[in-house]
């Protein structure tokens, strides 16, 4: 008889929670967890932003809760097992810069959305973020993206509690380096049986970068794509000395805290 539940303790299954960030594999993980949820009868819910930095809570029948912006507060959730993934914030800046130059996401095309920002210019009042980035050269555009990201997603990354044992911490660079091992560890943390871990890793493999894009990691898309190159460390090809200085000034110690650098002098 086929065992439906993936959990070692099938009578007391925890809520599964995955927290990520924009441009840090949120679509990738949603596809994987959606497939796993479908296989094992676990309802998947995507957390939606509500007032301020809050997120909609999981419903009573939710089995897998995906928070794409890491706004969920662990102490407000029912008993859970979670995963949380970060990416080199500098690569997030590069990925975000190129993506925001062409995406049709509503906020990027909303006139005046960037009004009042301390890094903005008075003649940009009423402009869309898309138009701002496309009106300046790459060097200035990356500086703008550093400012914007630092006030939002990078602030949340810096504020995250990395010592919460309920969350399995993951780094994009390590997942890309060995996807099978990374996902096996994640599903084991979730409390899956060895067989369920094996099956879930097989499902995750279907959504690997190469299988989805038909490109190797590091090979850039020829056109507009949500998945650009996937190569860790790409920031070093684009950051100038001024970009490095600006990033560290706004986000002091973040790269050392996350383990990407050993000192602030990078």
Name every feature range the model reports, one short phrase each:
Residues 42-60, 162-237, 241, 245:
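The conserved 3'-phosphoadenosine-5'-phosphosulfate
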Residues 1-170, 230, 242-266:
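PAPS-dependent sulfotransferase catalytic domain
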């Amino acid at each position: 008889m086929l065992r439906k539940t993936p959990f070692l303790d099938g009578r007391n299954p925890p809520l599964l929670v995955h927290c990520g960030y924009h441009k840090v594999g949120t679509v990738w993980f949603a596809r994987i967890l959606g497939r796993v949820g479908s296989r094992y009868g676990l309802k998947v819910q995507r957390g939606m932003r509500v007032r301020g930095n809050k997120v909609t809570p999981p419903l009573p029948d939710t089995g897998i809760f995906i928070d794409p912006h890491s706004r969920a507060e662990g102490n407000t959730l029912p008993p859970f097992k979670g995963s949380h993934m970060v990416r080199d914030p500098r690569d997030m800046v590069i990925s975000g810069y190129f993506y925001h130059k062409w995406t049709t996401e509503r906020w990027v095309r909303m006139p005046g959305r960037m009004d009042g920002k301390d890094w903005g210019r008075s003649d940009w009042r009423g402009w869309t973020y898309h138009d701002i980035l496309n009106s300046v050269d790459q060097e200035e555009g990356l500086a703008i993206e550093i400012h914007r990201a630092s006030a939002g997603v990078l602030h949340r990354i810096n504020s995250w509690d990395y010592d919460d044992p309920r969350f399995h911490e993951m780094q994009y660079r390590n997942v890309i380096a060995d996807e099978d091992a990374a996902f096996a560890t994640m599903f084991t943390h979730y409390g899956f049986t060895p067989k369920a871990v094996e099956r879930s890793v097989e499902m995750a493999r279907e959504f690997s970068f190469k299988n989805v894009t038909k490109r190797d990691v590091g090979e850039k898309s020829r056109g507009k794509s949500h998945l650009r190159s996937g190569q860790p460390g790409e920031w070093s090809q684009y950051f100038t000395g001024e970009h490095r200085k600006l990033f560290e000034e706004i986000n002091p110690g973040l790269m050392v805290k996350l383990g990407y650098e050993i000192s602030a002098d990078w």
